[in-house]
Regions:
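Sec-dependent N-terminal signal peptides
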Residues: 4-16
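Divalent cation-coordinating acidic motifs and surrounding scaffolds
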Residues: 18-135
């Protein structure tokens, strides 16, 4: 009986203290202009989080390449990361951007495909980017 109680106690408090850490960061024009030193700084800053969302990823190829470089840098730090990048928002050329999700694959699992919510594209310049994760 004592062993069962101890096991229950351990499982209860282990699950009670499980946390998922989320970070959201507007990196302002995150693209090819970011140096390797800046990418390393960003990776060192976000690496203790489980899910990272980035706003203002440059809409062109430089933005997708910068997110890929960040994911590579995070993967070199010993934990496996994956990422998804949105299509460009439907804003005017000067306001269009992308978003990105990065996550630790051992902490959370992406469910389905992330999407830009088109419902609001006439009311707002940059529609939100949604994703569902399983913890």
């Amino acid at each position: 009986m004592n062993k069962i109680f101890c096991l229950f106690f351990l499982l209860f408090f282990t699950s009670f203290y499980c946390q998922t850490k989320l970070l959201s960061w507007n990196l302002e024009n995150f693209g090819k202009s970011k140096s390797n030193q800046e990418i390393t700084f960003i990776a060192n800053t976000v690496r203790d989080f489980d899910i990272v969302t980035i706003q203002e990823v440059v809409a062109g190829n430089g933005g997708t390449q910068a997110v890929a470089k960040l994911a590579d840098e995070l993967n070199r730090k010993g934990t496996k990361w994956d990422y998804r990048i949105s299509e460009p928002t439907s804003s005017s050329a000067y306001k269009t951007e992308r978003y990105a999700f990065l996550w630790k694959t051992n902490a959370v699992k992406l469910k389905g495909k992330p999407w830009l919510e088109q419902q609001y594209h006439l009311e707002i310049d940059r529609e939100p980017y949604f994703a569902t994760f399983e913890i």
